[in-house]
């Protein structure tokens, strides 16, 4: 006879496991189940270990040590909600169990729930963890204060300290992303937004911001296109994501045509594709207008560079030079405002 379990956690765990709960004979001693779980853990087979822990818990739901081991296994898989539930079950069976309080304290601390984490650490008799928690809490407050005064580097620095403890705090990640962007640290801000995406399932706005910054501010066209495609993968019906993807694809295609013309020494054609002529406004103006909109709505922070426009201007300078034009950059105006006159 075989045991078949139907709990949600078990079903989820076995989706990527080579082991099925039906593979475990019903008369397997609990001690053997626990030994098998430990053996799988030692080999890094965490999902398979979880199947054995599930079987052991189903056989004896009041064994708090087995529940605790399953909870730590859940935690190693990033299943915080299930781990929290098991740790709370442990405490309902064994009140005051310090190991469960300590783990709950760490879970709460990682999420930036300072007061609940402090409470759990107190019950776990973990004064050093409680001390580190207070330091992180203080740093978080200093980061918020620095942001209010526009001291972006101080904000990012204090947020660094807080996030060492509160690694899964959504407000802190969003705050540090903002402060990093405002201080000109684009890569760091993008890294934080990628964490935000993991914590805010279904929210496409970080995808849009990441893509626009990569594509326009940093001139990382492939990365920008890849990020906005992830947005549509997350929400295929998103009009905002679709609009930005179409916009970026059109620019990328136009830029590739210009690059080919320059490579083939068709400099006149390339220059006409870049600047306003009777045939159109040119790619530089088109991109500048798109960037203006993205900066005005806050998608691209004003502190970040204009690398794509600068790249296009450089291409225009190359084309103009080759066809015999003198390039003028007027003092006090934008370096993207190109003026030119024919050589005599």
Predicted stretch roles:
Residues 56, 89-90, 123-124, 161-162, ...:
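Canonical positions in the second alpha-helix
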Residues 42, 76, 110, 145-149, ...:
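Register position in tetratricopeptide repeats
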Residues 29, 63, 97, 114, ...:
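Residue-level recognition of tetratricopeptide repeat
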Residues 28-59, 138-165, 256-280, 315, ...:
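Alpha-helical segment of the N-proximal tetratricopeptide repeat
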Residues 59, 93, 127, 165, ...:
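Structural marker of alpha-solenoid helical repeat scaffolds
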Residues 69, 103, 135, 141, ...:
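Canonical tetratricopeptide repeat
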């Amino acid at each position: 006879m075989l045991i078949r379990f139907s709990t949600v956690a078990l079903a989820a765990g076995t989706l990527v496991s080579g082991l099925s709960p039906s593979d475990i004979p019903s008369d397997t001693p609990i001690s053997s189940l626990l030994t098998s779980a430990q053996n799988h853990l030692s080999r890094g087979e965490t999902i398979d270990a979880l199947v054995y822990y599930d079987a052991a818990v189903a056989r004896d739901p009041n064994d708090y040590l087995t529940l605790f081991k399953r909870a730590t296994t859940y935690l190693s898989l990033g299943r915080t909600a299930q781990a929290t539930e098991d740790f709370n079950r442990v405490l309902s069976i064994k009140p005051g169990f310090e190991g469960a309080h300590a783990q709950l304290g760490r879970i709460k601390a990682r999420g930036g729930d300072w007061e609940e984490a402090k409470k759990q650490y107190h019950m776990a008799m973990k004064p050093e963890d409680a001390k580190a928690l207070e330091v992180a809490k203080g740093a978080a407050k200093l980061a918020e204060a620095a942001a209010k005064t526009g001291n972006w580097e101080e904000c990012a620095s204090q947020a660094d300290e807080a996030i060492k403890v509160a690694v899964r705090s959504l407000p802190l990640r969003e705050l540090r992303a903002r402060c990093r962007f405002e201080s000109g640290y684009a890569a760091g801000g993008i890294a934080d937004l990628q964490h935000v995406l993991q914590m805010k399932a279904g929210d496409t706005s970080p995808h849009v911001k990441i893509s626009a910054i990569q594509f326009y501010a940093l001139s990382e066209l492939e990365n920008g296109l890849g990020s906005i495609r992830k947005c549509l993968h997350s929400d295929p019906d998103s009009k905002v994501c679709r609009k930005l993807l179409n916009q970026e694809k059109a620019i990328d295609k136009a830029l590739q045509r210009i690059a080919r013309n320059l490579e083939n020494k068709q400099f006149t054609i390339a220059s006409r594709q870049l600047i306003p002529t009777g045939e159109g406004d040119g790619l530089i103006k088109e991109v500048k207008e798109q960037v203006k909109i993205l900066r005005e709505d806050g998608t691209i922070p004003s502190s970040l560079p204009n690398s794509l426009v600068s790249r296009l201007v450089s291409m225009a300078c190359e084309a103009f030079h080759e066809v015999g034009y003198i390039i003028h950059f007027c003092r006090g105006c934008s370096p993207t405002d190109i003026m030119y006159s024919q050589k005599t």
